[in-house]
Regions:
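N-terminal non-catalytic cap/leader segment that marks the start of a structured domain
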Residues: 1-110
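Non-heme Fe(II) oxygenase catalytic core, chiefly the N-lobe of the double-stranded beta-helix
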Residues: 115-143
């Protein structure tokens, strides 16, 4: 079982999901009175976890859309670039890294940057290209 933020009838709903069975249960159906978003769910999880048991057959995932877990973070997201050797080497060879040194697998110090909360998107969502600011995008980001 997993927790996910699903779009159901144009509304974001925090759900318990069984991806193998293709079913979900809205947390609000399992925990009467819960009406929050994923941030509230995470904050209240210690009090909710004993009540989070799938009941019945669940609802089919067909017709739902997986959203970003937290669609509107409260502040900028701090990121670390080139944080493992394979990615650092790949990025250095790509020609997009003006700071790369010959044979460098990872920098001596972390590459830290932020992304505005407004840049969060869900799986499969289109990535705005902003052609006025750049002609190429890095293909990867992860939490």
């Amino acid at each position: 079982m997993k927790f996910a933020n699903l779009k159901i009838d144009s509304t974001a709903v925090v759900c318990l999901v069984d991806s193998d069975a293709g079913t979900y249960w809205p947390v609000a159906d399992l925990v009467p009175g819960f009406s929050g978003d994923m941030v509230q769910f995470v904050q209240e999880y210690p009090n909710l976890k004993s009540k989070l048991e799938a009941k019945g057959e669940g609802k089919p995932l067909n017709g739902t859309t997986v959203l970003a877990p937290i669609t509107q973070p409260r502040r900028n997201i701090f990121c670390v670039g080139k944080n493992y050797h394979e990615h650092a080497a790949e990025f250095s060879k790509s020609g997009f890294d003006s700071s790369a040194k010959e044979g460098e697998l990872a920098p001596d110090f972390p590459v830290v940057f932020t992304k505005p909360a407004s840049t969060v998107i869900g799986p499969g969502d289109a990535i705005p290209s902003h052609p006025e600011g750049t002609s190429q995008l890095d293909y990867e980001a992860q939490f």
